[in-house]
Curated annotation (Swiss-Prot):
GO-annotated molecular function: 3'-5' DNA helicase activity; ATP binding; hydrolase activity; nucleic acid binding
Full protein name: Uncharacterized ATP-dependent helicase MJ1574
UniProt short sequence motif DEVH box, positions renumbered to this chain: 181-184
Binding of ATP, residues: 67-74
GO biological process: interstrand cross-link repair; nucleotide-excision repair
EC number in record: 3.6.4.-
Organism: Methanocaldococcus jannaschii (strain ATCC 43067 / DSM 2661 / JAL-1 / JCM 10045 / NBRC 100440) (Methanococcus jannaschii)
Residues annotated as signal peptide: none
Record domain Helicase ATP-binding: where: 54-239
Record's keyword terms, sorted: ATP-binding, Helicase, Hydrolase, Nucleotide-binding
């Protein structure tokens, strides 16, 4: 411990010790004795909470298991699947995970146990992965082979299985168990979308006379019963106490005093790496990971570090994960991409830069990653100059208690989001062909009437049944359940032959070509629309894993966008700041509340972002200026480019677009009006 904080002792506010916990074990009698043999072969004993969950499952109950990180939740469904497979080999199982990385990780674990299961029983459970990475040929193979277990994402359940449910009747008619892992991530707009994705699934299964069971797995929630009721409109049995052993942990709170934030993080990381301590360093944004990585370019431990982001190609992420597992890399600078349970081997320490925007929620998940193999763990928070950080600095004991208990207290899901509800009701009507109007709640009936006014569906009285029914008129366009856009943006090394090949590909060929480019290392990152406008407009510098790139031209082919980039000297010190304006129009007000003299509105907004250019600052702007001039000379960058220098060395480049870039979109939002307060201030 002393070595970890050597040279930064004065930055420590407080260190807490979280005591170790002993495990409690129990036994369970499976239908088939081979499963008990499998447990023996795996070399573990069942924890008491695993046995409680299994008892509920075997009594035909829906179950939510909300226990601490690394408490063996996944073992519950794996054992239940293997057991039921021996008795009912035609049953099917759908396993939902929020990320592809987590699916790959869990599929690997399932496959390892499946091999042991085969050695014991001479039978193997057929399991497949269905994600956006899976090509058309493999998808056809899945439909032909009809695996027992399907690992998939919420997105593929929405886009693929429900949209094309006639192709998946072999799965849906025989679906015995739906497993939803990492349930706690289903919050915010994503959570609202998932309420309706699950509603569509359950209504379809009801049509198919399938009353399946649901098993949900989650980090520790304060209100699990209410939360799963909100998501599924079903009653669940709750298992919410962990009986797995837990190692001793330390929680250290640091605040930059004599050092600035970057210097403190650097010293801390260097001390941890010098002591061979495997560490994750969490940041709120991808940009922050890259900024610190660049600050560490001349550090003695630089080659033991890497950034890790969800935007990196799959093969790059897997390469980083493997190097971290075997100790070639000792510290990862990451975002929430590693917040979930991806297996990266033993982990000794977690640093979080500040309190995350969602408060303690993410801290609990991140800190749960360290000390997962009966080893002591060190959790560190480096406070920022931020409102939330200031609050917890003044309430350290509250922070400690909430982390120690590991309970996520608040899960915001708004089930009355009109925009989301309207989309999913249209999908539902399209998928089921006919929907009983009276099966909808009052809010949904109101939305359906809007859809009828828009000419998308028809409400009519069935003369035979005398029921009011809804039929589809216009096919819906399926959009993302995570973002407002379905478009994909790829940052690619600039090679002329790639451009010519892309322009001659069909849509189905493009997906295969993109995967080939990823494997060959030409794809630097895959980003979303927001990140493109934020960081990758032509001429802007972009950092990835410590390397420096300059964004060049972009070509768009339907929903695919390709930004070409050149790699520059990684040691150049440059940074871009955008020049933009924002205009907001209020389209609709859904709700209004008042607090004292403040009016709080919730409604629909139209946002217009006007990008006028950007500024580049840093030590090496002279060199970067030449790169920008080359882009202009080649007709790639249509802008006025000026280099400004002053006596103090505060040099910068101003890039002003000759044609402003405009981005329009609609979103739900909250806004405040406090006219009376402002009026009072002006009066004074």
């Amino acid at each position: 411990m002393e070595d970890v904080f050597k040279g930064i002792e004065k930055e420590i506010i407080k260190i807490y010790k979280i005591p170790e916990r002993k495990g409690r074990f129990s036994n369970f009698k499976f239908k088939n004795k081979e499963i008990n043999e499998l447990i023996d072969a795996l070399g573990f004993k069942l924890y008491l909470h695993q046995v409680k969950a299994l008892k509920y499952l075997y009594n035909k109950k829906d179950v939510v298991v909300t226990t601490s990180t690394a408490s063996g939740k996944s073992e519950i469904f794996r054992l239940a699947i293997f057991d039921n497979f021996l008795s009912n080999p035609d049953d099917r199982y759908l396993l939902i995970y929020p990320t592809r990385a987590l699916i790959n990780n869990q599929y690997e674990k399932f496959s390892m146990e499946n091999e042991l299961f085969y050695k014991i029983t001479n039978k193997r459970v057929k399991a497949e992965i269905l994600t956006g990475d899976v090509g058309l040929e493999k998808r056809r193979e899945i439909l032909k082979d009809k695996p027992n277990v399907l690992f998939t994402t919420p997105d593929m359940l929405h886009y693929q299985i429900l949209k094309n449910h006639n192709n998946y009747l072999w799965l849906l008619k025989n679906l015995k168990l739906l497993v939803v892992d990492e349930l706690h991530v289903y919050r915010g707009v994503f959570g609202t979308n998932m309420v309706y994705v699950f509603k569509r699934l359950l209504k379809l299964l009801k049509r198919l006379n399938n009353n399946l069971q649901i098993l949900c797995l989650s980090a520790t929630l304060k209100n699990p019963k209410e939360f799963v009721k909100l998501l599924f409109n079903r009653d669940f049995e709750v298992v919410d106490k962990s009986y797995n052993p837990s190692s001793r942990k330390y929680l250290a709170i640091l605040e930059p005093k004599n050092l600035d934030n970057k210097q403190l993080l650097r010293r801390l990381i260097e001390n941890l790496v010098d002591n061979n301590i495997k560490t994750l360093v969490f940041f709120d944004t991808r940009k922050e990971t890259e900024k610190l990585m660049r600050f560490l370019l001349n550090s003695k431990v630089f080659y033991k570090l890497s950034t890790y982001k969800g935007t990196l190609p799959k093969y790059v992420r897997e390469e980083i994960e493997e190097k971290f597992k075997n100790g070639e890399i000792l510290a990862l600078l990451t975002t929430n991409a590693l917040e979930l349970g991806i297996d990266i081997g033993d982990l000794d320490a977690v640093i979080n830069y500040g309190i995350p925007p969602d408060g303690i929620f993410s801290l609990i998940q991140r800190f749960g990653r360290a000390g997962r193999r009966d080893k002591e763990a060190l959790n560190i928070i480096v406070l920022r100059k931020d409102g939330l950080d200031y609050y917890y600095k003044e309430h350290l004991n509250e922070l400690y208690e909430r982390i120690r208990k590991g309970i996520i207290e608040y899960m915001p899901v708004n089930i009355k989001n009109r925009f989301v509800t309207k989309k999913h009701l249209h999908y539902l009507i399209s998928e089921l062909k006919i929907v009983d109007f009276d099966e909808l709640n009052d809010f949904e009936k109101e939305i359906v009437k809007e859809l009828e006014r828009e000419g998308k569906i028809k409400i009519y009285k069935n003369p035979i049944t005398n029921k009011t029914e809804i039929r589809n008129v216009k096919q819906p366009i399926y959009s993302s359940i995570r973002t407002a856009s379905d478009e994909s943006y790829y940052l690619i090394l600039d090679k002329p032959w790639i451009k010519s090949k892309l322009l001659n590909k069909t849509q189905s060929e493009i997906l295969s070509f993109i995967n080939w480019l990823k494997i060959k290392g030409y794809v630097i990152e895959e980003v979303d629309k927001d990140e493109y406008y934020r960081s990758l407009i032509t001429g802007m510098p972009y950092f990835s894993r410590g390397k420096l790139f300059i964004a060049k031209d972009k070509i768009g082919i339907r929903k695919f966008h390709f930004i070409f980039a050149d790699e520059l000297d990684m040691f150049w010190d440059v940074e871009a700041l955008q020049k933009k304006e924002e205009e907001i129009d209020i389209l609709d007000i859904y709700d209004k509340k008042s607090y004292k003299d403040i009016d709080i509105y919730y409604g629909r907004l139209r946002v217009r972002k006007i990008y006028e250019g950007f500024i580049v600052r840093g030590v090496d702007v002279d060199k970067y200026y030449q790169e920008l001039l080359a882009l202009k000379d080649n007709g790639i960058l249509d802008a006025e480019i000026d280099l400004f220098k002053d006596f103090f060395g505060l040099n910068f480049i101003s890039v002003k677009f000759n044609k402003k870039i405009i981005r329009d979109f609609e979103t739900d939002g909250i806004w405040l009006c406090y006219f009376q307060i402002i009026l009072g201030m002006l009066t004074k």
